[in-house]
Amino acid sequence: MLVLGLETSCDETGVALYDSERGLLADALFSQIDLHRVFGGVVPELASRDHVKRMLPLIRQVLDEAGCVATEIDAIAYTAGPGLVGALLVGASCAQALAFAWDIPAIGVHHMEGHLLAPMLEENPPAFPFVALLVSGGHTQLVRVDGIGQYELLGESLDDAAGEAFDKTAKLIGLNYPGGPEIARLAEQGVAGRFVFPRPMTDRPGLEFSFSGLKTFALNTWQQCKNAGDDSEQTRCDLSLAFQQAVVETLTIKCKRALKQTGLKRLVIAGGVSANKALRASLEDMLGSIKGNVYYARPQFCTDNGAMIAYAGCQRLLAGQQQDLAISVQARWPMEQLPPL
């Protein structure tokens, strides 16, 4: 089955072609970072308009790269949520229009299920069951995964997601958008031990997260430095390192608890923050200490992309899941509501 995947949940237009027998054939992405950087964050209306501009050229591009023609496509998968409604509607409308014109099925895919399954595109995919850490700009969740659509939420953030905390903290200390990669870059030059951040909610049982306090702690620390006349680049580096260490250690502690609670030794990390090198190294060390394994996608498939949507949609289509031509998207969509395969 040859599936065209469309991703438009936020500020990246992703298109890919995935074949159930041959694997990923082509993948293309246009990032709107430069468009939104001047505003310090994503402007939904601008995001939607740019998706409209980019979608069809990217579809033509992946068809050319794969050496395919439209008549060879068996189905279309598109992101139906969660995400920005306007942006989602662009992808959904395009998918359903093409599906109608080509007389093929289209299926809406859950954005975070796409992220969760992205490591399946790698040479050494994880076997079920496993624990998944979904960590992005909008989500921080620990999920037990027994199969596609078989999800048990173990814990999640009670306020800011980890990626959101990265971006907001970066903005508070004067870094460019997107803030997560900027903090990671500066942290490499930071001096450890100068600042010590708390590890929120690690001193109590449970698998919930809270990152809003770290953002406030960073703001107060930065203001104290500025008031003392020390707002140097090195101070930003040291602050970035301390913040990153706090987030990474907090996530690692919670992941270890989740593995112990479930009795599992396989961990998948997915979502934009899973590309963070410090987080990967910390989780690899932790899994090594318990003789377990950690799995993640290559960096280009950690951020939003069409390949993960094409793959996830393909699995559901092969299992016989169907959908009518109604255009329906959801800004919020609990992953536990998805039907199991």
Curated annotation (Swiss-Prot):
It comes from the Bacteria. Its cofactor is Fe(2+). It is found in: Cytoplasm. Binds 1 Fe(2+) ion per subunit. GO terms for biological process: tRNA threonylcarbamoyladenosine modification. Its EC number is 2.3.1.234. InterPro entries: ATPase_NBD, Gcp-like_dom, KAE1/TsaD, TsaD. The keyword Iron applies. One of its GO terms (cellular component) is cytoplasm. GO terms for molecular function: iron ion binding; N(6)-L-threonylcarbamoyladenine synthase activity. It holds the Pfam family TsaD. Substrate binds at L134, V135, S136, G137, G138, D167, G180, N276. SUPFAM superfamilies: Actin-like ATPase domain (SSF53067). Fe cation binds at H111, H115, D304. It is an enzyme of class 2 (transferase). It catalyses: L-threonylcarbamoyladenylate + adenosine(37) in tRNA = N(6)-L-threonylcarbamoyladenosine(37) in tRNA + AMP + H(+). Keywords: Acyltransferase, Cytoplasm, Iron, Metal-binding, Transferase, tRNA processing. Required for the formation of a threonylcarbamoyl group on adenosine at position 37 (t(6)A37) in tRNAs that read codons beginning with adenine. Is involved in the transfer of the threonylcarbamoyl moiety of threonylcarbamoyl-AMP (TC-AMP) to the N6 group of A37, together with TsaE and TsaB. TsaD likely plays a direct catalytic role in this reaction. NCBIfam families: gcp_kae1, T6A_TsaD_YgjD. Belongs to the KAE1 / TsaD family. This is tRNA N6-adenosine threonylcarbamoyltransferase. It comes from Pseudomonas putida (strain ATCC 700007 / DSM 6899 / JCM 31910 / BCRC 17059 / LMG 24140 / F1). The gene is tsaD.
